[in-house]
UniProtKB/Swiss-Prot annotation:
Domain KH: from-to ranges: 24-86
Family note: Belongs to the KHDC1 family.
Protein name, per record: Developmental pluripotency-associated protein 5B/5C
Coiled-coil regions listed: none
Keywords, in A-Z order: Cytoplasm, Developmental protein, RNA-binding
Compartments reported by the entry: Cytoplasm
Domain of life: Eukaryota
Main location: cytoplasm
Pfam families: MOEP19 (PF16005)
Keyword Glycoprotein in record: no
Gene responsible for this protein: Dppa5b
A Gene Ontology molecular function term of the record: RNA binding
Length: 119
């Protein structure tokens, strides 16, 4: 069992203290992806916590890739589901970035199709 030191003071009411604050699910994500997941300045984080009934803590890692470590606390099945949800959202972000043509490519092929009629 992994015991971590929870630094958050605003523990959500659905998290049972102390039993839900041990053995967190942990994964790493780039800070840019984290902004996609939680919004600017983490504006959507509390909503995602409430919907998933989990609690998240973020820890900056000193790395050139600007990685953030995400700790997920809560009941075991809730932690696993919340981790899966966040990792799925991160994967979707990466897939969208790969499919999205760069602006350079966009303008190399003539920019927007001006022959389309407005509806």
């Amino acid at each position: 069992m992994m015991v971590t030191l929870v630094t958050r003071k605003d523990i959500p009411p659905w998290v049972k203290v102390p039993e839900d604050l041990t053995d967190p699910e942990v994964f790493q994500v780039q800070s840019l992806v984290l902004k996609y997941l939680f919004g600017p300045q983490g504006s959507r984080m509390s909503h995602i916590e409430q919907v998933s009934q989990a609690m998240f803590e973020l820890k900056n890692l000193e790395s050139p890739e600007e990685l953030i470590e995400v700790f997920i606390y809560g009941y075991q099945s809730i932690k696993v589901r919340a981790k899966w949800l966040l990792q799925s959202m991160a994967e979707r972000y990466h897939l969208r970035q790969q499919k999205r043509p760069s602006l350079t490519t966009f303008w190399e092929f003539g920019g927007p199709d001006v022959s389309l009629k407005e509806c």
